[in-house]
């Protein structure tokens, strides 16, 4: 009796699992239904402990490498991360099974602003303190403790979702080696002239007191006057209104100019008014001056056809160069003074007035209006739609502020990155994003990389401050800020020693007593460290291709694929290409950019906690009740109104909660969505459907196992010689050549599947692979093949044909499980281990040294080039024709039974009358499938290739008559008649005489079927989420129902 291999808990050894052999399995020895918790438990730990995630040398063969886009350490993984890991892990597992040396590096991003904000909030809630109360050093200690906790949570989530990452190579963007890479990159880019310091307008968050990046800016559209509640402040502020203010003219003969502004509080920074040079209304104001209402200084009237639109408002624009991006450009064109009116915390500074100094700029808005009213200069308030820029991290309104910052010159690097894509050195999938790539990089601006935070990669720069040799005072102490910024000197260095060496190299100052160094207290933008991730995760700058050809840097760069969300193509992917190629001798960091779209809810809405439509992958995997969903919501930091809205959203979206679906179901569902579309509308019902698919896979496998029990060792060895050892082209295939028509058909279908799936992986179109795998198993394997062979396999005597069919069952299931494994790793591992193993494999499994060599994840992936998958190719057309004729016959007879209202249990006589040139072929096919045909249709089948109607001798059932009720043609070569017993015949004749008595119910039933199918097909998500083959089946069924209904109405 052959032996099977299983995974089992291992006691008293380091590995959680061991392989062992025992008697073959049958239906009674595994659980009756699929339980994802039981199936998925322990397997990941076994894989990891066995070292299966590490690259295995293949003696110079092909390699495949990826890095996981490092999740922010700030919290839990969301459904978008699950899509990323599903796609990436599927690619990794596929290439590992293809025999390549595979590396997938995990990592976490320190997420500067998000992490600092989260820890500050926790500090305030738990201790009532700010970071300033703790001081920089102690605050950073708390942040590191916090990140340790959350990084563990994230890594556990990645393991739960089956991500086969090499954890021994895990990195963190603030660990010692990555921090050194960041410092090195900054210094080298500074020395190359790519990093420089400049004073410009930036997006400033007063709450964080830092610059923020464009990706951290939320844009909120306000249509009318609204009192807006901001997370960063207790008081609401009015927005959506524009205020008209009068500016008195220096020339008393000129009428005041009326300006419109949504931000009256910025009036203290006004240094000019602008009019259009061709505006006839203001031709007398050319070259004139207005008087500032608060400081009473003269401010010029400038002519500017760029800033001013004559058709908008009054046609006069106030210019505040220090606090508006457009005004700044205008101020530069006309050499206007730049007056900053804000402190770092958003309060007004000394450039306002004594009355306003220290007042928050949003509180000052109403105070300024009141003061202008007292002066008689306030005219009116009007409704005015506006778009607000809000910090996504703090919820505060952003302010354009003039600040000295560090910048990266991007133009040359961007041009080179465009060239990489145009030359094909880097491929972008979907290709539609090539245009975005070119457009974004063509119009790129220099990148502000400094942040005024405590948490992040420190900037390795020092300001050189000259000192008075006599007084020992700083020489710039008496300079204005503008003068000081113009004269300041900067050097770079990882430490003060390096910085002093650079002082001498740059400025020729040898005497350390002539100056002092002041370390820059800012940190770098998180995207700077992330931009280095492909090379820093491989050991750069310590490891290079010149240093050691055996390191990861030499072996695995460039990465084969960089897979990530399309929303960060510019913010992250483009910067990786620019920075890594610049720092690595012009070499690209990866060959292919694979982008997936944003995941939305089933209604196409963006997922948001405030809408109650966010899907937590762990909730899908483990299941959660509606009550628990509501309880989690109640603990969130949403406002009370947002909680009310979100609760309604939860009740609508998940009225029964979310049932336990398991990891495999979630992964398979995500993989089935095409990634070349704009967005993915995720429907929980699809995941639940794939949970049922898992159960069907489980039950079908049990069916297969039940028929493998009585196979002998010779059969098993034949099976393994011909299937698992497919690379050996010399093995005999005699037993497969003698299999039945339906066996050959399923093997042909399997071969086609192998071709489609492999091609899908090569083209990075994984949804085609996933949909094809679903369709093959659901329809070809289960609905057709298994149903057809049940009649033969159920016979009490085990024939050679039955044995061959059993081997085909095992063979197809084995190949299918291996193809499905990258998408559904847990259930496939469990079921594959239950398949029979060859003697050689058992010997390997029993070897302590290499007892991990029989996991499905390191088995061979089915390859269309193997001889096993080339069988019957020369018979393909003939086999397809025969089986399709058989299936069409089944379908039509079933349809006729439904049309006539015949009970499934009613015994039929079915006569096949074969005519034409292919009588022998058709007769052979129906003879081979006769048992299946009779079992599936509860019938007796009589075959007459000579069109002879005298078939009574073939009828052994005395209760059946030869009165033909229904005759029809299947094809030009095949006609069929159906006969019933006398009682059924009388009933049918009665229905034909009084059709309305039976037709009313039939019409109603058909109309309901038609409506259900039509509604499903008309659903906008139908084409996106339903496999093409299933779509065709449903459309065909709909048309069939319509024809049946039409025929009834005719009668």
Swiss-Prot record:
It catalyses: tRNA(Val) + L-valine + ATP = L-valyl-tRNA(Val) + AMP + diphosphate. It holds the Pfam family Anticodon_1. Gene3D superfamilies: 2.170.220.10, HUPs (3.40.50.620), Isoleucyl-tRNA Synthetase, Domain 1 (1.10.730.10), Valyl/Leucyl/Isoleucyl-tRNA synthetase, editing domain (3.90.740.10). It comes from the Eukaryota. Its EC number is 6.1.1.9. GO terms for cellular component: cytosol; mitochondrion. One of its GO terms (molecular function) is valine-tRNA ligase activity. Its main location: mitochondrion. One of its GO terms (biological process) is valyl-tRNA aminoacylation. A motif ('HIGH' region) lies at residues 71-81. Residues 1-20 form a transit peptide. InterPro entries: aa-tRNA-synth_I_CS, aa-tRNA-synth_Ia, Anticodon_Ia_Val, M/V/L/I-tRNA-synth_anticd-bd, Rossmann-like_a/b/a_fold, tRNAsynth_Ia_anticodon-bd, Val/Leu/Ile-tRNA-synth_edit, Valyl-tRNA_ligase. A motif ('KMSKS' region) lies at residues 606-610. CDD domains: Anticodon_Ia_Val (cd07962), ValRS_core (cd00817). Keywords: Aminoacyl-tRNA synthetase, ATP-binding, Coiled coil, Ligase, Mitochondrion, Nucleotide-binding, Protein biosynthesis, Transit peptide. It is found in: Mitochondrion. ATP binds at residue 609. Residues 972-1019 form a coiled coil. PANTHER family: VALINE--TRNA LIGASE, MITOCHONDRIAL-RELATED, VALYL-TRNA SYNTHETASES. Belongs to the class-I aminoacyl-tRNA synthetase family. This is Probable valine--tRNA ligase, mitochondrial. It comes from Dictyostelium discoideum (Social amoeba). The lineage of its organism: Eukaryota, Amoebozoa, Evosea, Eumycetozoa, Dictyostelia.
């Amino acid at each position: 009796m052959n032996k099977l291999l299983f995974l089992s808990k291992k006691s008293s050894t380091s590995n959680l699992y061991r392989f062992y052999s025992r008697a073959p399995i049958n239906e009674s020895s595994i659980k009756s239904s699929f339980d994802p918790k039981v199936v998925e438990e322990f397997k990941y730990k076994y894989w990891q402990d066995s070292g299966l995630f590490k690259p295995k040398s293949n003696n110079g063969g092909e390699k495949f490498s990826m890095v996981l886009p490092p999740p922010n350490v700030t919290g839990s993984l969301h459904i978008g991360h699950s899509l990323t890991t599903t796609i990436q892990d599927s690619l990794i597992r596929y290439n590992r099974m293809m025999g390549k040396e595979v590396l997938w590096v995990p990592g976490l991003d320190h997420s500067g602003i998000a992490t600092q904000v989260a820890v500050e909030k926790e500090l305030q809630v738990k201790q009532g303190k700010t970071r300033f109360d703790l001081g920089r050093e102690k605050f950073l200690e708390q942040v590191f403790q916090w990140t340790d906790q959350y990084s563990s949570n994230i890594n556990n989530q990645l393991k739960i979702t089956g991500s086969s990452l090499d954890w021994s190579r895990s990195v963190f963007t603030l660990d010692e080696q990555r921090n050194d890479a960041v410092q090195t990159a900054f210094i080298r880019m500074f020395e190359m002239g790519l990093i420089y310091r400049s004073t410009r307008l930036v997006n400033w968050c007063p709450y964080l007191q830092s610059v923020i990046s464009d990706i951290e800016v939320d844009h909120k559209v306000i249509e009318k006057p609204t009192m807006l509640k901001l997370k960063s402040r207790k008081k609401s502020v009015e927005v959506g209104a524009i205020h008209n203010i009068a500016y008195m003219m220096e020339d008393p003969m000129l009428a005041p100019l009326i300006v419109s502004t949504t931000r009256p509080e910025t009036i203290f920074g006004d240094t000019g008014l602008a009019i259009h040079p061709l505006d006839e209304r203001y031709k007398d104001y050319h070259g004139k001056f207005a008087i500032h209402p608060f400081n009473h200084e003269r401010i010029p009237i400038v002519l500017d056809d760029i800033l001013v639109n004559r058709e908008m408002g009054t046609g006069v624009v106030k210019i505040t160069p220090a606090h508006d991006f457009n005004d700044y450009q205008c101020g530069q064109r006309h050499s206007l003074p730049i007056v900053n009116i804000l402190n770092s915390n958003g309060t007004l500074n000394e450039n306002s007035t004594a009355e306003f100094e220290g007042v928050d700029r949003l509180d000052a808005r109403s105070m300024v209006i009141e003061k202008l009213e007292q002066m008689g200069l306030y005219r009116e308030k009007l409704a005015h739609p506006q778009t607000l820029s809000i910090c996504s991290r703090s919820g505060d309104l952003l302010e354009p502020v003039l600040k000295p910052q560090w910048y990266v010159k991007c133009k040359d690097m961007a041009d080179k990155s465009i060239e990489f894509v145009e030359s094909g050195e880097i491929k972008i999938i979907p290709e539609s994003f090539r245009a975005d790539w070119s457009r974004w990089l063509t119009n790129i601006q220099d990148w502000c990389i400094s942040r005024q935070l405590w948490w992040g990669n420190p900037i390795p720069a020092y300001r050189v401050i000259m000192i008075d040799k006599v007084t020992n005072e700083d020489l710039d102490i008496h300079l204005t800020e503008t003068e000081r910024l113009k004269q300041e000197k900067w050097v770079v260095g990882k430490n003060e020693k390096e910085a002093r060496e650079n002082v001498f190299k740059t400025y020729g100052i040898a005497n350390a007593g002539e100056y002092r160094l002041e370390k820059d207290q800012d940190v770098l933008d998180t995207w700077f460290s992330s931009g280095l991730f492909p090379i820093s995760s491989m050991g750069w700058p310590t490891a290079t291709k010149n240093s050691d050809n055996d390191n990861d840097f030499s072996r695995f760069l460039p990465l084969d694929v960089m897979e990530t969300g399309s929303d960060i193509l510019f913010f992250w992917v483009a910067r990786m290409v620019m920075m890594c190629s610049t720092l690595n001798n012009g070499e690209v960091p990866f060959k292919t950019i694979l982008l997936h779209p944003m995941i939305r809810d089933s209604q196409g809405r963006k997922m948001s906690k405030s809408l109650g439509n966010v899907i937590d992958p762990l909730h899908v995997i483990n299941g959660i009740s509606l009550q628990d969903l509501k309880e989690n919501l109640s603990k969130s930091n949403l406002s009370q109104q947002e909680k009310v809205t979100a609760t309604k959203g939860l009740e609508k979206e998940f009225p029964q909660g979310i049932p336990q679906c398991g990891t495999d179901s979630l992964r398979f569902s995500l993989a089935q969505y095409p990634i070349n579309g704009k967005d993915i509308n995720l429907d929980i019902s699809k995941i639940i459907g794939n949970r049922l698919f898992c159960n069907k896979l489980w039950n079908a496998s049990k069916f297969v196992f039940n028929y493998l029990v009585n196979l002998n060792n010779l059969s098993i060895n034949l099976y393994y010689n011909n299937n698992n050892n497919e690379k050996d082209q010399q093995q005999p295939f005699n037993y497969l050549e003698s299999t039945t028509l339906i066996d050959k058909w399923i093997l042909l279908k399997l071969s086609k599947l192998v071709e489609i799936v492999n091609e899908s992986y090569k083209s990075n179109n994984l949804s085609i692979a996933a949909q094809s795998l679903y369709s093959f198993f659901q329809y070809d394997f289960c609905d057709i093949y298994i149903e057809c062979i049940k009649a033969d396999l159920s016979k009490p005597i085990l024939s050679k044909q039955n044995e061959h069919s059993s081997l085909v069952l095992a063979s197809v299931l084995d190949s299918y499980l291996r193809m499905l494994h990258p998408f559904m790793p847990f259930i496939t591992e469990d079921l594959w281990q239950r398949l029979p193993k060859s003697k050689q494999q058992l010997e390997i499994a029993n070897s302590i040294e290499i007892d991990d060599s029989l996991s499905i994840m390191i088995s061979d992936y089915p390859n269309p080039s193997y001889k096993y998958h080339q069988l019957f190719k020369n018979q393909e057309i003939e086999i397809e024709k025969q089986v399709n004729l058989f299936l069409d016959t089944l379908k039509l007879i079933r349809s006729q039974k439904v049309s006539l209202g015949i009970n499934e249990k009613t015994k039929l006589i079915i006569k096949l009358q074969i005519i034409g040139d292919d009588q022998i072929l058709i007769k052979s096919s129906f003879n081979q499938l006769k048992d299946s045909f009779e079992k599936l249709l509860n019938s007796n089948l009589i075959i007459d290739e000579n069109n002879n109607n005298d078939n009574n001798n073939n009828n052994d059932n005395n209760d059946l008559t030869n009165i033909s009720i229904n005759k029809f043609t299947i094809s030009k070569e095949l006609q069929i008649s159906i006969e019933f017993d006398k009682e059924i015949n009388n009933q049918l004749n009665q229905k034909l005489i009084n059709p309305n008595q039976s037709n009313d119910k039939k019409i109603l039933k058909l109309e309901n079927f038609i409506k259900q199918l039509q509604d499903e097909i008309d659903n906008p998500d139908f084409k996106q989420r339903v496999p093409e083959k299933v779509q065709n089946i449903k459309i065909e069924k709909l048309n069939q129902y319509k024809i049946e209904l039409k025929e009834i109405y005719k009668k």
